[in-house]
Curated annotation (Swiss-Prot):
Cofactor binding annotation: Binds 1 divalent metal cation per subunit.
Record family assignment: Belongs to the IspF family.
Gene name for this UniProt entry: ispF
Molecular functions per Gene Ontology: 2-C-methyl-D-erythritol 2,4-cyclodiphosphate synthase activity; metal ion binding
Protein name per UniProt: 2-C-methyl-D-erythritol 2,4-cyclodiphosphate synthase
Site (Transition state stabilizer): H34, T133
Cofactor: a divalent metal cation
Catalytic activity: 4-CDP-2-C-methyl-D-erythritol 2-phosphate = 2-C-methyl-D-erythritol 2,4-cyclic diphosphate + CMP
Binding-site residues for a divalent metal cation, renumbered to this chain: D8, H10, H42
Database matches in InterPro entries: MECDP_synthase (IPR003526), MECDP_synthase_CS (IPR020555), MECDP_synthase_sf (IPR036571)
Gene Ontology BP terms: isopentenyl diphosphate biosynthetic process, methylerythritol 4-phosphate pathway; terpenoid biosynthetic process
Subunit structure: Homotrimer.
NCBIfam families, alphabetized: ispF
The species this protein was found in: Salmonella paratyphi B (strain ATCC BAA-1250 / SPB7)
């Protein structure tokens, strides 16, 4: 078994909506990013890549490459997952924690789980997504941005 951890953060800027966990969420502010700014899928992709010792999302999809400008993070996740599977890994489970004062994530979490399960080709029971605030402390608490942490468990596929 191998465990990976991922973290991502994006500052608010411009106009919304925002995309978190593949879900378009109405909000007056957008997120500043080279891609679509999906902190949940970026953190998850990093966790998966880390567990497989394949580096991180920035190595695989550099923000200096114009090809990834405005990229759909679901596509990035699927490509990373293909590479991980090619190394002989299967998924144990993933757990994602979104850290944001606003907007409220709870109504959107079921669809996030559906999208992640679809992208990883796994059961919904293997995907957990939750959200929390920092009780108005720090940059997320002041409404300056959104952060996310994720962990992933991989196993070598049976031969």
């Amino acid at each position: 078994m191998r465990i990976g951890h991922g973290f991502d953060v994006h500052a608010f800027g411009g106009e919304g909506p925002i995309i978190i966990g593949g879900v378009r969420i109405p909000y007056e502010k957008g997120l500043l990013a080279h891609s679509d700014g999906d902190v949940a899928l970026h953190a998850l992709t990093d966790a998966l890549l880390g567990a497989a010792a394949l580096g991180d999302i920035g190595k695989l999809f550099p923000d200096t490459d114009p090809a990834f400008k405005g990229a759909d993070s679901r596509e990035l996740l699927r490509e990373a997952w293909r590479r991980i599977q090619a190394k002989g890994y299967t998924l144990g489970n993933v757990d994602v924690t979104i850290i944001a004062q606003a907007p409220k994530m709870l109504p959107h979490i079921p669809q996030m789980r559906v999208f992640i399960a679809e992208d990883l080709g796994c059961h919904m029971d293997d995907v957990n997504v939750k959200a929390t605030t920092t009780e108005k402390l720090g940059f997320t608490g002041r409404g300056e941005g959104i952060a996310c942490e994720a962990v992933a468990l991989l196993m070598k596929a049976a031969k």
